[in-house]
């Protein structure tokens, strides 16, 4: 079962969240037909969005990460609800590049580094809060760390990983965010840095030992306490009603033109691939939204 586990350590000076998202990322791979490198990029971004989304307190809140680094992968979009359930897509899911010299998938080259890492938080106000930073590496975790520090002023350490098996299915996927509370002592910071530097490979821990081992390695030398756990999944909220609302927003002239063409139209969801078909009569029945002055 995919899940997020949260813990605190160092007498409250450290907050850590771990995500295990193998099934979620595998579902995304199946929906979009992702090649291994594209799967790793999308999977890391889904994990990042889930970790950030589940930390929002407002009911029905949503968090969106958008990345476009100018690489062959195109843009990445990942959306999380306030429980960490996610959906997403990439511009070119067939993107596949040669492995790096260390044998790892070359996510940074696929994403590119000439662009922005943008986070939008919609908590039900008139306008969402939007923050952006320039991409650091295109490897996602480093970019997320930079965003949290520069845009939200939260010192953090992040790791994200996706292990793709020889048959192109997802063998492991997940990551963590460790955040320091204001006033954390230098000794705590140094110990955390050493622990993260010395830890085993992230996806190896998740596939062989599980989340608890990840907590033990990252928080070695600290007393830590689990404060919450809940399941997450790949979840799309599309519906025929939402598609009708989107069509209503294009205006009466455009709707009339589509109906007069005399052919059925199909509208596909970018997140889950579901197709919604409308006949000319159904298009005529859609009431256009009034234009706001």
Regions found by a protein language model. Give the residues of each.
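Interaction interfaces in information-processing and related assembly proteins
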Residues: 1-228
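Cys/His-clustered metal-coordination modules, chiefly Zn-binding fingers
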Residues: 196-293
